[in-house]
A protein has these predicted regions:
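A structural boundary/capping signal
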Residues: 2-358
Length: 358
C-alpha cells in the first residue's frame, strides 16, 4: 500500500554479480487485518497492496529466476511466487498470505515475524531473512490521509452474522404479517418506499428493545495512532454481544442488517461523525438516513430527523458516501469471524429465536 510513508526495510547487499533483495513489512511494520484479508483475495499480479513486499533488483547481466516464499510464522499459510527478472531490471512482489482464524480473534497489537526465503530454480537458497511485524487488532481500521481508505469500512458490514440474523428475527415480529421482505421490486416505487420505512423502523425498535446504547470507545495503539487516520470499530457481533456501540459501530451494525435483507445500505462520513442510509426502493435515488447514536434513548422519527439535520450542516465536499454494493464489487468483503465468535453468536441467535418478541 502506497501511503507516502517510509516503511521498515531489511536490505541484504550481494556481490555486484548477484541480485539484491529488499523486504518491507506492512505500514511501518503494522499489519491491519482488514487490508490483509482484502489482498489475500486477489491474484498477486492484481494487488496494489500486500502484507509483505519483496523487491528483487537484478544487477547481473543475465536473466534471474527465483522462487520466493513468505509466511507469517504461526499466523498464516505460506505464499509462493515464481518470478523472472531480466538483467538490469527491478521487480516488486506483493505477498498477502492467507491468515488463520486467530488473526481475526486478536484484539490487541501483537508481535509476529515474517519469514522470507528465496531459492533458485534448482532449489538452492540464495537469500533468507525475517522481518518483525506488529499485527493490529482485528477491530482497527486505518482510514488514511483524507480518508482515502474509507471504503474498507465495508469489511465491518457482516450481513450473515448469526447475531445480526437474530435481530432480524426479533424485528419481523414488529412488522405487519411478520415479514421483512426487503425490496419487493414487483410493487410500485411508492409502496416499496413505505415498506422500507416500516422495516427500518422495526429494526430500530428491535435494537432498542435489545438495549443497544451509545458508548464512546475508539482508542487504539500502534505506529498509526492519530485519531484522524486510525480508529477502533467494533464488529456487529461485538456491539450486539455488549449491547453498546459508538456512532461508527452502530452504522456498520445497521448496514449489516440492511444488507442481509438485500437492501442497498450506504455509510456516510462527515467530520467527526457517521450516519447510515438505505435506498428506499431498488431503483430509487432517494435514501432514508438514520442517526444510530440515539438508538437507545430516542424514538425512530427523531433519529431520522437528526440524521437529515446533521448531514445538512455540511457541504457535499465534506461528505463521504460509501455504498456497500460498490465496495463488494471492488472486492471488499466482510472480515471472517473466528470459529469461537461464530459459535458464541450461534448460541445467542438460538436463544433469541426461542424468545422472539410477541
Amino acid at each position: 500500500m502506497n501511503t507516502g510513508r517510509r516503511d521498515p526495510v531489511v536490505t541484504v547487499q550481494g556481490r555486484s554479480t548477484e541480485p539484491t533483495y529488499e523486504v518491507r513489512g506492512g505500514l511501518e511494520g503494522d499489519v491491519f487485518p482488514v487490508f490483509a484479508n482484502y489482498a489475500s483475495f486477489q491474484r498477486p499480479t492484481e494487488r496494489e497492496t500486500g502484507t509483505v513486499t519483496v523487491t528483487v533488483t537484478n544487477s547481473t547481466d543475465s536473466l534471474v529466476r527465483n522462487r520466493v516464499a513468505v509466511q507469517v510464522q504461526g499466523w498464516s499459510d505460506q505464499e509462493i511466487q515464481v518470478t523472472e527478472i531480466a538483467a538490469g531490471q527491478v521487480r516488486k512482489l506483493l505477498f498477502a498470505p492467507t491468515f488463520r482464524a486467530r488473526l481475526y480473534q486478536n484484539r490487541e497489537i501483537t508481535a509476529a515475524t515474517a519469514l522470507v526465503s528465496v531459492t533458485d530454480m534448482g532449489g538452492h537458497e540464495v537469500f533468507s531473512t525475517t522481518v518483525p511485524l506488529r499485527l493490529r487488532s482485528a477491530d482497527d481500521i486505518y482510514w488514511g490521509a483524507n480518508f482515502e481508505y474509507a471504503q474498507f469500512i465495508a469489511s465491518w458490514v457482516t450481513p450473515h452474522d448469526p447475531r445480526v440474523e437474530a435481530v432480524l428475527s426479533r424485528a419481523k415480529e414488529l412488522m405487519p404479517g411478520r415479514r421483512l421482505p426487503g425490496y419487493e421490486t414487483w410493487r410500485a416505487p411508492g409502496v416499496q418506499e413505505k415498506t422500507t420505512l416500516a422495516q427500518v423502523k422495526a429494526i430500530y425498535r428491535a435494537l432498542q428493545r435489545k438495549g443497544v446504547s451509545y458508548v464512546k470507545s475508539s482508542s487504539t495503539m500502534g505506529a498509526h495512532v492519530n485519531a484522524d487516520v486510525t480508529e477502533r470499530v467494533r464488529m456487529p457481533h461485538e456491539s450486539l454481544g455488549h449491547v453498546s456501540a459508538n456512532c461508527i459501530d452502530g452504522v456498520v451494525l445497521y448496514a449489516s442488517l440492511f444488507e442481509n435483507l438485500g437492501m442497498d445500505p450506504v455509510i456516510v462520513l462527515v467530520p467527526g461523525h457517521a450516519y447510515v442510509g438505505v435506498r428506499l426502493a431498488q431503483d430509487s435515488t432517494q435514501f432514508l438516513y438514520v442517526e444510530t447514536a440515539v438508538t437507545g434513548r430516542l424514538p425512530f422519527e427523531v433519529a431520522v430527523k437528526s440524521a437529515t439535520a446533521g448531514m445538512a450542516k455540511y457541504s457535499e465536499s465534506q461528505i463521504i458516501r460509501i455504498p456497500i454494493t460498490q465496495a463488494r464489487e471492488a472486492g471488499i468483503y466482510p472480515m471472517p469471524a473466528s470459529s469461537k465468535e461464530a459459535q458464541s453468536a450461534s448460541v445467542d441467535a438460538r436463544e433469541a429465536n426461542q424468545n422472539s418478541l410477541p
